[in-house]
Amino acid sequence: MSRIVLALIRFYQLAISPWLPPRCRYQPTCSQYAIEAVQKHGALKGGWLALRRIGRCHPWGSSGYDPVP
């Protein structure tokens, strides 16, 4: 399951993200964070961490360095 999730994220990074303006407020970017979270914690917990991170990434939220726990 992790391989499928990672493949979907990498597809986004290679095929969709280059067409969008940069807008992530964090380092690493949300998609890179998602890859690291899935690799470290597996598809379910890593996916949940990635969704929470994406939910925090908005113009009125905080910014800065936010590593995978």
From Swiss-Prot:
GO CC, one annotated term: plasma membrane
A Pfam family matched in the record: YidD
Bilayer topology annotation: Peripheral membrane protein
Subcellular localization(s) per the UniProt record: Cell inner membrane
Major location (coarse): membrane
Keyword Protein biosynthesis among record annotations: no
InterPro entries noted in UniProt: Membr_insert_effic_factor_YidD (IPR002696)
Keyword check for Ubl conjugation: no
Superkingdom to which the source organism belongs: Bacteria
NCBIfam families assigned to the protein according to its UniProt record, in alphabetical order: membrane protein insertion efficiency factor YidD
PANTHER family membership: MEMBRANE PROTEIN INSERTION EFFICIENCY FACTOR-RELATED
Role noted for this protein: Could be involved in insertion of integral membrane proteins into the membrane.
Entry similarity comment: Belongs to the UPF0161 family.
Name under which the protein is recorded: Putative membrane protein insertion efficiency factor
Organism: Laribacter hongkongensis (strain HLHK9)
